[in-house]
């Protein structure tokens, strides 16, 4: 029997995803037409003998999360539960805190994955690889190749080329270590908790040695904060227990709002083989479709509109006559009036783009000439200026007719009256 754990973080995390995360927990943000974490759940549901999926995070349970979990259970026929941390405990602290729930039923192994990654999720090949490399006493990291410069932004893995054993692991090194990076997807045997317990005990000992701040009440919490990458993998490396399974499939982090459009492109391209029914096509009396496009069945799209490539249109969206949409995500209830143009943009829930308005951003795609290039997590500002990126319209934003919004972030509930360029509109 197998299980899976998906680490979904909490409201203090994912701040680079604002203003979109103001309205919905980041794991529920729709990417390629479905909530981000649903891609993980669907991949887990296809693993033979996987009986339960546990979501661990420190979001307060709410109606949106509960409703999503109920629907996902019914659709994928697998038990799904949400376990709420009392505080941010780190990637290792969360699973250690809920180790009894993870180990109940006696799973032979369990997957752990971060919610903010986009991947083909080669879980079954990882499982086969795990059985061939030690089984009950071994642990597997999913790795992929990055270029030398970008590898410094990730956990770097030095491995034995023959056995794939991890010999050395460094999280975000200061100098080049390896071009094999950690994808944030793992397969553990239950014995991993022995190693996490050692870190917990070490944290307790260090706290006792440095317990000069006795008035603080967070001492127990500090011992429970454990990071798999820095605290566990670094000590396991080189001891014949930690292995890397390298994938050549698509993979990306979803840290910023701009990376959601790139992730949507990757998932839409997968739909041609995994879910062709989700992709729209040009039909007589319908809009012109170019490339991979998802249109929710309840959306109203004028036949003269042109959509694609890489467009996702959400529930209840209205797309008027002559509208052009490319490389964009249009969220629930948005209205794009006649002849508006939306490029490299996320249009928020219930927002409105007026007639003949143009809303455009700058794509933050990986270098197309480098097969190992990843999407850069750009800082919001560079040299005092807003870094050109995709345009984001928050929830319930109104754009008037015949204006241009370029490379800007518009916070929720704003009614604009003129054009803006390279600005954050508060």
From Swiss-Prot:
InterPro entries: GMPPB_C, Hexapep_transf_CS, Mannose-1P_guanyltransferase, NTP_transferase_dom, Nucleotide-diphossugar_trans. It comes from the Eukaryota. Its EC number is 2.7.7.13. One of its GO terms (molecular function) is mannose-1-phosphate guanylyltransferase (GTP) activity. GO terms for biological process: GDP-mannose biosynthetic process. Pfam families: GMPPB_C, NTP_transferase. Pathway: Nucleotide-sugar biosynthesis; GDP-alpha-D-mannose biosynthesis; GDP-alpha-D-mannose from alpha-D-mannose 1-phosphate (GTP route): step 1/1. Keywords: GTP-binding, Nucleotide-binding, Nucleotidyltransferase, Transferase. The keyword Zinc does not apply. It is an enzyme of class 2 (transferase). One of its GO terms (cellular component) is cytoplasm. It catalyses: alpha-D-mannose 1-phosphate + GTP + H(+) = GDP-alpha-D-mannose + diphosphate. Belongs to the transferase hexapeptide repeat family. This is Mannose-1-phosphate guanyltransferase alpha-B. It comes from Xenopus laevis (African clawed frog). The lineage of its organism: Eukaryota, Metazoa, Chordata, Craniata, Vertebrata.
